[in-house]
């Protein structure tokens, strides 16, 4: 995949205060079609509220696509079954997918960046 080396290069050059803000998410979650699932992403230090969180969906054999940006915004074409939220009290972000469909089976990644820039 041509994008993988570029992505690794960009991550290797991440500098600044936000580079020290680490997010942790569960290894896997599962639920039945038609149900609702929530995937959480917890910040290790600092305040998640001072960072924007994005969520990516990666289906097998495909490049990642953005499903949520700036904490809770959906790109054009992403169904409203996908929603994002921030919980400052637990220093975490969540991606919620309602009305699960088989096509939602994928890897999901959270990523943050400094919202002041």
Swiss-Prot record:
Keywords: Adaptive immunity, Cell membrane, Disulfide bond, Immunity, Immunoglobulin, Immunoglobulin domain, Membrane, Secreted, Signal
Disulfide bonds: 41-110
Region (Framework-2): 53-69
SMART domains referenced in this protein's UniProt entry, alphabetically: IG, IGv
Gene Ontology cellular component annotations, sorted alphabetically: extracellular region; immunoglobulin complex; plasma membrane
Coiled-coil segments on the chain, per record: none
Stated name of the protein: Immunoglobulin lambda variable 6-57
Organism: Homo sapiens
